[in-house]
Amino acid sequence: MADTIRAYAKINLHLEVLNRRDDGYHNIFSLLAGIALSDSVSLEEADLRPSREGGVEVAIRSLGGSCGHVIESMPPADNLVGKAAILFCRKAGLSGSVSFAIEKNIPVGAGLGGGSSDAAAALRLLNQTAPSFDDQDLMALGSCVGSDVPYCLTGGFALCAGRGEIVRPLRGDLPYEVGIVDCGIHVDTGGAYRLLGRSVDYQTPNALTMFEQLCEQALFSGTIEPVRGMLRNDFEDIVCGAYPAIAAARDRLKACGAVYAAMTGSGSSVFGLFSSSAEIDAAREALRGTARVIATRFVSNRMHAESAATRRSTERMPDVAH
């Protein structure tokens, strides 16, 4: 029986790319939301002991899932779960071996944060097995693994800044049906940043304080309307220009009734917010043969916190409609 955490996907409801930093990263400002599409990450074995060297051997196996083949073909050192485990043990002064198993359902390289969410789950599991860090230190550790990992440790609705390490959780919910279109296109994130051409002195045109207030109003009222006019993704125009199929999928969601549709992250997935599952079914039919449509919903901060508690189980995660 393994300790298991559900690792939720995310979408960027809003993503501004700000100035390029001296460390080569970019500052961003984003409204993120967790969705029920998820992987499951299990810590099957952990043989750890104090050590000055802090070296650890990591094994990762696939438990299947719609994207399980990715785990099978990826060396542990290239998987963010493996990187998270190695960093955790080095910082905690632990050596030995750990073994993870992942049921992979979140498309890879699609702007849905699957790898980061898996890494966040691995950090939680390791810290529960070998308590070493408080929440703040675990967030700092996560930022060294990947820019989205601090958010994935928090989940739900949140505003993120810096390069992603500054996370402000938001209360409330948006009771929409969410349709995700997996376009099956790999978009190079580094290339997308280069195409934006942000300089070190670039400043955002958005009034951030007003935006934050409108986000809170939207989540409190349960509708995207208060903030919809300010939402954007700075990558969307350049990526859609390079890959017309992504723009076509987004536009198809709008035509099928989405109250808001956009690209998430640097692509290639797009999402739509719908009033009913029937509208998502219509989008699935319209895109049949060209892209996969996943029906899901938002995950609140409370739901994410509850899932972060480990459960001893070998059960498969419930499926999300495709």
Locate predicted features.
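ATP-binding N-lobe of GHMP and related small-molecule kinases
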Residues: M1-A110, Q128-F133, D173, D182-I185
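Residue-level signal for inorganic ion chemistry
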Residues: L13, V41-L43, V81, G115, ...
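DPxDG-like acidic metal-binding loop motif
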Residues: V81, A110-Q136, Y151, G155
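Phosphate-handling active-site elements
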Residues: C89-A101, L125-V145, S276-G289
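Conserved, helical-rich catalytic subdomain that frames metal- and/or nucleotide-binding sites
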Residues: T154, L159-Y260, S275-R288, I294-H322
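N-terminal pre-core extensions flanking Radical SAM catalytic domains
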Residues: M263-S277
